[in-house]
């Protein structure tokens, strides 16, 4: 990343198209949290396999893109529909060497913007049946406001019109 370009952590290959009419969908367990990923301590393979409380269950296919998952999350989460909201996706998978889970970042999408991760599929992210998807939803930051107005009050507006510096 020395030349200032954005580089994705997951390489996008070209997979064969999946016929959704013939292939049975799988159950995808998605866990969302605001401004952060769920703590790994909430994913516990002991004690009956506890998981975070904010679970969404979706039936989808391995060729489902991160943009499609974003749309499905927005259907059930009205706050996430705002332009500029960022969805940071990670896969939570069992660590094969121990009885715990590990979190692996796979990409992010933003409402109202196109991104390099939009068309990544679960298959390209190396998702396996039995894994979870953890999504950190970050609402756009609120700009400086005056009396609930983006541009300030009437006085501020008049001052900007008269100012020689624009």
Curated annotation (Swiss-Prot):
Pfam families listed in its UniProt record: SAP18
Q: Which GO terms describe its molecular function?
A: transcription corepressor activity
- Compositional bias, Basic and acidic residues, is annotated for 147-158
Q: Which domain of life is it from?
A: Eukaryota
Q: Where is the signal peptide?
A: none
Can you supply a Gene Ontology BP term from the record? negative regulation of DNA-templated transcription
> Which keywords describe this protein according to UniProt?
Repressor, Transcription, Transcription regulation
- Which is a Gene Ontology cellular component entry for this protein? nucleus
Q: What segment(s) does the record annotate as region Disordered?
A: 143-166
**Family membership noted in the UniProt record:** Belongs to the SAP18 family.
The record ties this protein, via PANTHER family, to:
HISTONE DEACETYLASE COMPLEX SUBUNIT SAP18, SAP18
Subunit and partners: Interacts with SIN3 and histone deacetylase.
What exactly does this protein do?
Acts in transcription repression. Involved in the tethering of the SIN3 complex to core histone proteins.
Its recorded name reads Probable histone deacetylase complex subunit SAP18
- Protein's organism: Caenorhabditis elegans
């Amino acid at each position: 990343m020395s030349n200032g370009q954005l580089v994705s952590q997951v390489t996008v290959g070209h997979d064969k198209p999946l016929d959704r009419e013939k292939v049975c969908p799988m159950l995808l367990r998605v866990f969302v949290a605001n401004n952060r990923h769920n703590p790994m301590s909430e994913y516990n393979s002991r004690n009956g396999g506890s998981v975070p409380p904010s679970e969404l269950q979706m039936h989808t296919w391995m060729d489902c893109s991160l943009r499609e998952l974003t749309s499905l999350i927005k259907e059930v989460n009205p706050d996430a529909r705002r332009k500029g909201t960022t969805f940071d996706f990670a896969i939570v998978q069992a660590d094969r060497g121990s009885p715990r889970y590990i979190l692996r970042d796979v990409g992010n999408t933003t409402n109202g913007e196109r991104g390099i991760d939009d068309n990544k599929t679960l298959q390209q992210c190396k998702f396996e049946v039995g894994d979870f998807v953890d999504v950190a939803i970050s609402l756009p930051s609120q700009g400086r406001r005056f009396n609930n107005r983006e541009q300030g009050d009437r006085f501020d507006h008049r001052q900007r019109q008269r100012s020689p510096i624009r």
